[in-house]
Amino acid sequence: MCGIIGYIGNDKAPKILLNGLRRLEYRGYDSCGIGVVDNNKLIIKKNVGKVEEVAKKERFLDIDGNIGIGHCLHPDTYVILPDGRMKKISEIDEDEVLSVNFEDLKLYNKKIKKFKHKAPKILYKIKTAFSELITTGEHKLFVVENGKIVEKCVKDLNGSELIGVVRKLNYSFNDNVEFKDVYVERHYKLDETIRNKLRKVREKLGLTRKDVEKLCGVKEIYIVKIETGKLESIEEERLKKLCSLYGINFEEIIYRDNLHYTNPVKFPKTPTPELMQIIGYIIGDGHFPSNRMLRLKDERKEVLEEYNQLFKTVFNLEGNIKKGDGNYYILEINSKYLIDWFRENIPELFNKTGNERTPEFVFRLNNDLVASYLRGIFDAEGYIRAEAKQIGIGMTSKCFIKEIQFLLLRFGILASYSKIKRKEENWNNTHKLLISDKKSFELFKKYIGFTAKDKMEKLEAILNKMKGLNFRYISIPLTKKEIREFVGVPLKTIKNGDNYCTDYTIEKIIEELNSKGLYDKAEYLKRFLDADIVWTKFKIEEVESDVEYVYDLEVEDYHNFIGNLIINHNSRWATHGNVCKENAHPHTDCKEEIAVVHNGIISNYKELKDELMKKGHKFKSETDTEVVPHLIEEELKKFKEINEENYIKAVKNAIKKLKGTYALVIINKNFPNLLIGARNESPLILGINDDGYFLGSDITAFLDYTNKAIPLEDGDVVVIKKKENGYEVTIENNGNTVEREMMEINWDISSAEKMGYPHFMLKEIMEQPEVLKVSAKISAEEIKELAKCIKDYDRVYFVAMGTSLHAAMVVEYLFAKLGKLVIACDASEFLNKGVVDDKTLVIGITQSGETYDTLKALRFAKKNKAKTGAIVNVLGSTATREADITVMMGAGIEIAVCATKTYTSQLMILYRLFIEYGKLLGRDMSEYEKEIDKIPNYIKEVLDKKETIKEIANNLKVNNYIFISKGINIASALEGALKFKEITYLHAEGMSGGLLKHGTISLIDENMDTVAIVPPRDSAVFNSILSNIEEVKARGGKVIAITPTEIDGAENILVPEVIEEISPIVYAPAFQLLAYYKAVELGRDVDKPRGLAKSVTVE
């Protein structure tokens, strides 16, 4: 449920509960219900539907009664994501991680949910040879105990168990990485023939050198030097200007006269093995003394000679190698353009010592490219110790070392981690990785290796002497004794013992079992040997918490994830049930004496439910909430006498067993004078008036009755007792009675519903990051089905009106990129110009699902045997019933007439439709898919500029505005103008920048402001819109630029630099806020503009 309310007092509970549910309905409901104690009977009324619909159907107000209700790990833990990146659990915003299937011991991508909890005072540190993990005592790990893989709480570990760690990462990668070019000013070498040609053409045209300067800007003195040979070369731009003035074809002079430029540096478009090796070495031991020089150093001259050749291959640049002051050589590469290119594409190369990081794109690359990157790092900082039989690397950046450790796992190379504390003052600690087992040595040699010949010779020599001995990890978590018992026959390879086998021994056992014909036994052991995980010993200690919050994940299916290489158990994947009467709140116990409403998620509900079912409890729903009344019922059984005091204790004991986020309100028919509430990370507010007390998930629930409230805090349990002469209210936290400050709310109902924002429109604009997270996932199968229809049908129309039509215009551009013609059509004109038959697909976009013209277009299409689809926000609307395929947007209720969050939600759905269509064509759409999860953060960046936008809006003084853009953002210009005029009541017109010269530019002066929506810098129309801006400025027009880059002479609203395909989504909040703040400044009715309705249901 989206909101809950409880009441105890002298008034009729059903009336107050119904009113509270009505007030909370703006949050969105799919079902609702109430529970009331009347004459010691618990009466539950609930069903699927809107509040009024359910209240009427279930006859809420027929009930009497005066009491009722209406509906971890340390944050620095690194988790492995499916694309190979590692990310702190506290920073994860992805929806999948890698999880272990203990059936085949392999890793798979699984969906997750993340939870944050208050950290206890004491945590536990688990230390293995490979990593450390800091966690709460209640957190579970997968361990081996007595030869079996079991789940065990950290606080119960004794150190004799084995913990699972990752040995190899297998996942799909996407190396579709493209680098940006940087400007390189070319200088062309001129011979005497070209000099004379330029001079003769000038003279033939009758131009003096002074004339040339005036006409094209090339200085007279420069022309003298070129023609007389005092300058041996000429810059490309100046040569182009002269050619243009002289009427000479620039390309022709370059190729026919065989001109060569003197600085022929080249830049790669995509990663190559040679480039990745260079990048690895620079991060390891590179240095930029200036903005035009790079230095590498090494003890071995031949290594630098090899890297000099790599620079020649990749960049067409050669450096100089010289002897350094010590026992090393230096390779210097001098090129400003090379440094510019590195700074533009790989800024991580410029991190200071101690802050080294792997460029993020590296994690997306294929293994060949990653191997080259690692080779460069190990060339720079790696070493071999022949005596210790170890390959090692040490750096002062812990994060970078961890990244190397993760990347090595791609190849099955397991490296142990250690931290060396430096005794010297002001010296950073060193973080080291050591590779010491034979299997990892072999894989390192095969995939990575060293450039230095002597290092490779040492590696070979060590390998020749090594056996398959591994003392830091165990591949098969069975002792020798347990292995002999498992195979059931005598083995020559091993004798009974309580120790574990090395890989070398396991290989010998497998050979022996195969020779005996015990192939199934051999295959079972080989499965462990080839697994993605191994097992290791550990140490454990208690430590004081140094953080306020700890984190946990819910992982579907396998219920585990990788944290700091260690396999962690999770809070079970919560199934909260479908929309049905059984799953509606309130929920009751077996005897139907206790009723509970709940907001949030009980993350350990599955374990609790399993335990309760074993004890005979019968569940009626699929929800997590239902465990609460059953748990209270079970706790009550522990008391010989059931009285008020013991009931309260039972409730508190039950609450202690809950994990997750919750706001609970609880009643019991046997104790009609008690109302109990509990809060943990989900809002719950206590309302107070003379006739009773309220509990609500927000103030709106009871603001009609009182403005006095106490916001409860995490861990609070409130007990409200109704007595003959008044009420007794107790708030406890961790068993201690606490006082909470009462506040008087000055909001009216409208302000409360707006969550304190002055208008619904602003609230809905600010909700967009969260809304888009829903729109990014909803209706996945329906979108795939609609994409297939687009592929199968000859003609495709998107019909819509107003804001929805602008969204449809965006989709025209998206599908054009994939070679598919789709038509965005004004639904009111579709009957006049639509060409419709049984080979036609017509998709209606309508927020309400009730837009008259859009429904009329869909009905016209069906009448002519076309296939129909609808992209809709309101479930159960007319459009959902009439279309063949319905795609829900998931934007939630939008109250303001002016569409904001529903527009960006529509764009997200259409962007996903574009991606699915591309996949059907066999295109690689992975880069586009990755942008989906980034969009909410991009939107947040724009929303963070709201004060800047407000200031700009308040400085707009004219009554006429033009919104311009080009390409896909023409739709943004049209939508921006629509937003502006519909709530400011000022004239605003949106158009393509290309139309300015076709009449509109004559209107530009100091009384006409222009809002320019500037596309991303890599857009083909970026320079064109800049030209439009200059045209406006030249005529005295003021320019407001919504832009990813500063525009001189304009008032800039800076937005993130994104790919062009998602820019209409990212830019939208900027012009929405601009319109909003200007309308507020003018005193307009922002939420209900004059003459407009939320849904146009008439012609």
Swiss-Prot record:
GO CC annotation: cytoplasm
**Enzyme Commission designation:** 2.6.1.16
Keyword Transmembrane helix attached: no
Could you state one GO biological process linked to this protein? intein-mediated protein splicing
Any idea where the Glutamine amidotransferase type-2 domain is?
Answer: 2-71, 571-723
Instruction: Name which cysteines form disulfide bonds.
Output: none
Localization, per the record, is:
Cytoplasm
Q: Name one GO molecular function term.
A: carbohydrate derivative binding
The active site is formed by 2 (nucleophile), 1094 (for fru-6p isomerization activity)
Q: Which Pfam families match?
A: GATase_7, HTH_3, Intein_splicing, LAGLIDADG_3, SIS
Q: Which residues form the signal peptide?
A: none
Q: Which residues form the HTH cro/C1-type domain?
A: 198-253
What range(s) does the SIS domain occupy? 786-923, 948-1089
Tell me how this protein assembles.
Homodimer.
**Could you say which protein family the record assigns here?**
In the C-terminal section; belongs to the SIS family. GFAT subfamily.
Instruction: Give the protein's biological function.
Output: Catalyzes the first step in hexosamine metabolism, converting fructose-6P into glucosamine-6P using glutamine as a nitrogen source.
Output this protein's name. Answer: Glutamine--fructose-6-phosphate aminotransferase [isomerizing]
